[in-house]
């Protein structure tokens, strides 16, 4: 998966 930074810079989501 690729780690993408969402609106909150401290939150990472695997897309």
From Swiss-Prot:
One of its GO terms (cellular component) is cytoplasm. Keywords: Cytoplasm, NADP, Oxidoreductase. One of its GO terms (molecular function) is oxidoreductase activity. It is found in: Cytoplasm. The keyword Ribonucleoprotein does not apply. Its main location: cytoplasm. Its EC number is 1.3.1.-. Belongs to the NmrA-type oxidoreductase family. Isoflavone reductase subfamily. This is Isoflavone reductase homolog 1. It comes from Pseudotsuga menziesii.
